[in-house]
């Protein structure tokens, strides 16, 4: 069914909550493992209608945050979502209390029961009101960000539409673009500072209600991290700071030499080449035709997937006023349909987001069609889900010429370099959030000072050159994840470590790399992060020294492929 034909009906929350009670009672009383497994499939499907309605509302709202009808529907789900989540937790409690619960591990692997335990430990009826308040705060942030229009070049532009100006070869144009963006954020400084302070206090309060020291501790449960915790994440960040950052300084020196910008300021960093950054082919249809060819030639599975996506209007990727910034993939379970949202701005990032979100959507498409996989185990933890997307960016490389033509080699260098350099920024965001939630009484200026300290630790090559907003250490406020989904961002780093390994494998044997990727995808949410890496024969990045060799290989490749 085409997206435009999908009908929306606000769900009956009372009926759903009553169904949840009935399912919980049956789960507690299930007489044997076989009955419990059957019931698990049933409860998983019970939320399909609600989740479909919720995602339809969110898609329409984020496509136009000014639409009063969809704003009201988004408010409805913000208000009722916590009660539904907690009703789901009650079902998990009932499964866990059943003496035959081990049957679920036998049927579905290690993540099912561990995930239910995390759900139970991370939610409680006592936090419903706080969760509702948090949802409302996030919606306010989305309105501030999504409503951004700035004046530049005689035009009213959204934040994503500033992208091409930030990459312009004229340094004055780049600076003007950053200053226009900075002006908007500075104008909303008090509001953004207050919103973040309220979010930190809210989530820390939720953590205390549930018996945790602060939200940084609770986040490991809420993010459903299975088999590792804060100790392993710190070890990972330390490796990046000690083993990767020195190599990144070498990489950034290569970039400066390549561009001829001897002492690059922050506003110079988006320029990757003397003659300008690679540009994808123009036009929505031309790009979509290229994507169809690319995925048809990659594999039979991706051919079927891309036809389904394009034939059913499951892309909304062009930027326009009122549309929320960023990109995402979500699922509409009643239709077994992924949906991709993005904001193209005629930079190479348009191809990044296309291949990235198609990686998420491809995994969702495959999992939704596997009868063995229950609906709520279709997707693994976020650190694993991001492997699907980030690896797809690299595994489509043999077809990037369809989207870049003569700029293909430039894009290969830009994309690979950016992915490698990203590790430092991702760890910076994660450490910053740990500091914020462990020190909730920091003033806005103190928060910004902490960010600037971390900039020196993880990205010592940056010179803000008195740039407004960024120069005072507030640049983190334009990172959606810090407000919307705290502690998610490190997942991109963990998945990048897998994606870089897929990239290195593909250099010598693309077919083998793709087959490993497909094995990983087909395990859906039935395996943990470390188990998925083992499935694909990849290194786990928590052990000391595990990153260094990969980082050196990446640096060597970049040095050999300077354009």
Predicted features and spans:
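Glycine- and acidic
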Residues: 122-123, 179-188, 228-234, 269-280, ...
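Inter-helical turn/loop segments and adjacent helix faces that build the functional surface
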Residues: 230-231, 254, 258, 298-301, ...
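Auxiliary, metal-adjacent structural segments of Zn-dependent hydrolase domains
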Residues: 274-334, 347-348
